[in-house]
Curated annotation (Swiss-Prot):
<dbReference type="GO" id="GO:0015935">
    <property type="term" value="C:small ribosomal subunit"/>
</dbReference>
<comment type="similarity">
    <text>Belongs to the universal ribosomal protein uS19 family.</text>
</comment>
<dbReference type="InterPro" id="IPR020934">
    <property type="entry name" value="Ribosomal_uS19_CS"/>
</dbReference>
<keyword id="KW-0689">Ribosomal protein</keyword>
<dbReference type="GO" id="GO:0000028">
    <property type="term" value="P:ribosomal small subunit assembly"/>
</dbReference>
<dbReference type="GO" id="GO:0006412">
    <property type="term" value="P:translation"/>
</dbReference>
<dbReference type="GO" id="GO:0005737">
    <property type="term" value="C:cytoplasm"/>
</dbReference>
<dbReference type="InterPro" id="IPR005732">
    <property type="entry name" value="Ribosomal_uS19_bac-type"/>
</dbReference>
<keyword id="KW-0694">RNA-binding</keyword>
<comment type="function">
    <text>Protein S19 forms a complex with S13 that binds strongly to the 16S ribosomal RNA.</text>
</comment>
<dbReference type="InterPro" id="IPR002222">
    <property type="entry name" value="Ribosomal_uS19"/>
</dbReference>
<keyword id="KW-0699">rRNA-binding</keyword>
<dbReference type="InterPro" id="IPR023575">
    <property type="entry name" value="Ribosomal_uS19_SF"/>
</dbReference>
<dbReference type="GO" id="GO:0003735">
    <property type="term" value="F:structural constituent of ribosome"/>
</dbReference>
<dbReference type="Pfam" id="PF00203">
    <property type="entry name" value="Ribosomal_S19"/>
</dbReference>
<dbReference type="GO" id="GO:0019843">
    <property type="term" value="F:rRNA binding"/>
</dbReference>
<keyword id="KW-0687">Ribonucleoprotein</keyword>
Length: 93
């Protein structure tokens, strides 16, 4: 179900408050967040946000091309195990 056009995109208030405070002070430090659903705003460009992936925080540097996407899109939750077969089973066939 899509979000109503009357509503603004979701951003966790605490995260946005921290970003705005850092912009006022011209600070650049990493911010930890568990809010993967937060939408990236233009005010966040240039900051590094550590997004939680379920076991650790993944640092994500925000660029202009990321605006409008969600933070969780840039912190994958599943680790990929390769599909290669064991050498012994490959030799038998």
């Amino acid at each position: 179900m899509t979000r109503s056009s009357k509503k603004e995109p979701f951003v966790e208030e605490k995260l946005m408050r921290r970003i705005l405070e850092m912009n006022e002070k011209n600070e650049k430090r990493m911010i930890k967040t568990w809010s993967r659903a937060s939408v990236i705003y233009p005010e966040m460009v240039g900051h590094t946000i550590a997004v939680h992936d379920g076991r650790k925080h993944v640092p994500v540097y925000i660029t202009e091309s990321m605006v409008g996407h969600r933070l969780g899109e840039f912190a994958p939750t599943r680790t990929f195990r390769s599909h290669k077969k064991d050498d012994r089973t490959a030799r038998r066939r």
